[in-house]
Amino acid sequence: MESLQGKESNGAVPVCNGGGGAAAPPAKQQLPEGTDALRYANILRSRNKFADALQLYTTVLDKDGANVEALIGKGICLQAQSLPRQALDCFTEAVKVDPKNACALTHCGMIYKDEGHLVEAAEAYQKARSADPSYKAASEFLAIVLTDLGTSLKLAGNTEDGIQKYCEALEVDSHYAPAYYNLGVVYSEMMQFDVALTCYEKAALERPLYAEAYCNMGVIYKNRGELDAAIACYDRCLTISPNFEIAKNNMAIALTDLGTKVKIEGDINQGVAYYKKALFYNWHYADAMYNLGVAYGEMLNFEMAIVFYELALHFNPRCAEACNNLGVIYKDRDNLDKAVECYQMALSIKPNFSQSLNNLGVVYTVQGKMDAAASMIEKAILANPTYAEAYNNLGVLYRDAGSITLSVQAYERCLQIDPDSRNAGQNRLLAMNYIDEGSDDKLYDAHREWGKRFMKLYAQYTSWDNPKVADRPLVIGYVSPDFFTHSVSYFVEAPLTHHDYTKCKVVVYSGVVKADAKTLRFKDKVLKKGGVWRDIYGIDEKKVATLVREDKVDILVELTGHTANNKLGTMACRPAPIQVTWIGYPNTTGLPAIDYRITDSLADSPNTNQKHVEELVRLPESFLCYTPSPEAGPVCPTPAISNGFITFGSFNNLAKITPKVMQVWARILCAVPNSRLVVKCKPFCCDSIRQKFLSTLEELGLESLRVDLLPLIHLNHDHMQAYSLMDISLDTFPYAGTTTTCESLYMGVPCVTMAGSVHAHNVGVSLLTKVGLGRLVAKTEDEYVSLALDLASDVSALEELRKSLRELMIKSPVCDGESFTRGLESAYRSMWHRYCDGDSPALRRLEVLADQTGEDLNKTAVKLADLKAQRVNATAEEDNQSPVTKFDATSKGGEQPQPQIMVNGVTSPEGNQAVKAQPQIMVNGVSSPHSPSGRCEANGHSSR
């Protein structure tokens, strides 16, 4: 690095008089005299024999004290022996004798400069130049000292004066590279980067091996986002100076940024390569390790992600983002205790880290710790009032606690902040089902508007290569994240098992986050029958659409609707000529790209007033076919026989138990002396939720001592055996149970339900009627109460029904997988025939929509804003219409790493994805000759 002193003289300045000829020294050992003595002294000095030369100069001066050449020579020798004051006396005396002696004046300037007297040094050099304009040494040293003066003034805060001195230096010596360099430093600090870059380029032009200039040029290019140019500059710098630590660190930063850039552009493998190359230049660079963790998380290589997050923490123990993202991984692995530990560690580093506050709240929500969850999410909002996903998760919390109105309000607040929030948009639609009685079209309109907005984010296919042969074997695709022990799995098992694989090639697109034994059983079954199983978890929805087209799927059936981890983005692309929605959601998806919605004539009567974007296709029997769990265990006797009292119960989630439902239940319990109520759902592990529920029933006249509240039971066998606690199951409304109703009936417990005007209200109607218990379907609240009281009045009849109910159910259409699948295949074939005849409901719908909006949806650019790597809260609840819960995982790369909350990393679940956090970003410092700065820390950036 260039020093302020510039070049050292060390006798290099030529002597003015006489000279240093090349004559050999006298043969005799006696000291020469006169002119010979002076010539010999100059020779000795040129050979760095300063002591011997000094003796001769002194001899000469003893005889001729005004000999300027001897005075200068003696001064140089004294200067070389670190005797600057004595040397200055010699040079000063020489100037007295010869005021125009440029050499003596220059040496005076050198001593003044060495002593820090820059002004005096400059004056001496200027006098030397005036005395002899051709004397190059004076100009060179004047340029150096003017540059040093400029730096001193700049450091003292006098920037303009400093610039003036640098410019004066260049007027003196237009080739003096450090002056250009220091001007570059000043203009960089003044944010005038174009001027600074020009100065650095001139410095490098004058001095091609000027490593610092290339380093700082790299800083400017990097800060402009011109990473390739920055890396080229750092590479040139390190070629010149391989051990230049600042440049090596800056190279690591630029490579990390480049890795993040190419990763975001879709080349994650190249991104990983750049991150690893960054570690070659700085093996302890925590940001590169952190971003490797994010990348491996996005590649679903969570073991490697954990390794690099741990390494990032080792080299930067203050990296709260690494702690946060580790928490996301552990949460997704169901290691909730470890996840909580990681989030708490992140918060110990950054107490107001909104992503970790949010994520901790989400875990507490999953655990049913509603009070703790609310506290964390509210703190996240307090830390960042515009943190949209925190409001989304607050909505999930309210939903789980049964406060649907507050839930919808929270989702709408999220959408006010971020109108493109997919999670909040879909969660809002789901929540509205819990309180919709079908009295108006508000919910339909909400779905339709969401669908129109969502479709604009995707380009739609409008032609397919699938041969239009009416009766050829069909390729049926099923797409869902719920091919594990989840409510949907009990209803999709029948077609996976009973499809005629010679007539229907089945392709399963499994988005399961964490596979279990049921997942493996399904996969084995499909593959053995000749089907195809594709694991699509973590794959972009547009890429999934490409897979569907490559598989030439004729009919694509989505099983999720607006619940967690759905692939409606794939459906919006319309990769299959026929698209269907079934079983995962109790309402229209709102997507114009979906042709049909499968139902039956009881869940959606032919004269229904409920509107759907899709065309309804009614199966001949029930639209549901239940495959019981082999872990269910035997039916237990009616508990009233041994208890001496009737126990009513419900295992539906709390969101379905509306105030009106509680009023009706209280009427029933109050009318049956000594009867009890047992309710099981996740939030009841929270004391405040329990107390609120009991207090509401108390206000309705039901003593809390008659109510048993159970939290979520995780083991399926234990959950099913819990039905042995109840004699009669009470369904919810207007959102009826589905899986809970089937479980209740299978365990011998009759269920009372109520018909309504919307699909969600009538699922129980369909199930009970097809099982042969249509008599337990009420049309009004009074009839609902009456039916429950009638059942409770005859314990013997209850016992008889309990003994026969499982067999009755197994023999009914609700459990007849073979017949159900034949009916489903017939419906698929009818859809296909219509398509072959040119009838496509979705295409007609899209044409109308395009005409209405004046847009060509088929040419819409596919870009979903902030769709970061999502990790959503898909919990296996009883009926498990899971809302989308977003975790924030953070991702950073160089200047503005965008995690993925999740969507893109882990930051979010948006696991990596995402909302993404504010990690520490290493910012390039500017190295100057005075005080080269390495790296400094500043807040960067959204993951994911």
Swiss-Prot record:
PROSITE patterns for this protein: TPR (PS50005), TPR_REGION (PS50293)
Reaction(s) catalysed by this chain's protein: L-seryl-[protein] + UDP-N-acetyl-alpha-D-glucosamine = 3-O-(N-acetyl-beta-D-glucosaminyl)-L-seryl-[protein] + UDP + H(+); L-threonyl-[protein] + UDP-N-acetyl-alpha-D-glucosamine = 3-O-(N-acetyl-beta-D-glucosaminyl)-L-threonyl-[protein] + UDP + H(+)
EC main group: transferase
Example of a GO biological process term: gibberellic acid mediated signaling pathway
EC number: 2.4.1.255
Positions annotated as TPR repeat: 34-67, 68-101, 102-135, 143-176, 177-210, 211-244, 252-285, 286-319, 320-353, 355-387, 388-421
One Gene Ontology cellular component annotation held by this UniProt entry: nucleus
Subcellular location as annotated: Nucleus
Region: Disordered, residue numbers: 873-944
Major localisation: nucleus
Compositionally biased spans, kind Polar residues: 897-911
GO molecular function (one): protein O-acetylglucosaminyltransferase activity
SUPFAM superfamilies (alphabetical): TPR-like
Tissue expression: Expressed in all parts of plants, including immature leaf blade, leaf sheath, mature leaf blade, roots, germinating embryos and aleurone layers.
One matching Pfam family: TPR_16
Keywords linked to the UniProt accession: Gibberellin signaling pathway, Glycosyltransferase, Nucleus, Repeat, TPR repeat, Transferase
Pathway note: Protein modification; protein glycosylation
Ranges where the record places region Catalytic region: 422-944
Glycosyltransferase found in the keyword field: yes
Lineage top rank: taxon: Eukaryota
Family assignment from sequence similarity: Belongs to the glycosyltransferase 41 family. O-GlcNAc transferase subfamily.
Its job: Probable O-linked N-acetylglucosamine transferase (OGT) involved in various processes such as gibberellin (GA) signaling pathway. OGTs catalyze the addition of nucleotide-activated sugars directly onto the polypeptide through O-glycosidic linkage with the hydroxyl of serine or threonine. Probably acts by adding O-linked sugars to yet unknown proteins.
Name the record gives this protein: Probable UDP-N-acetylglucosamine--peptide N-acetylglucosaminyltransferase SPINDLY
Organism: Hordeum vulgare (Barley)
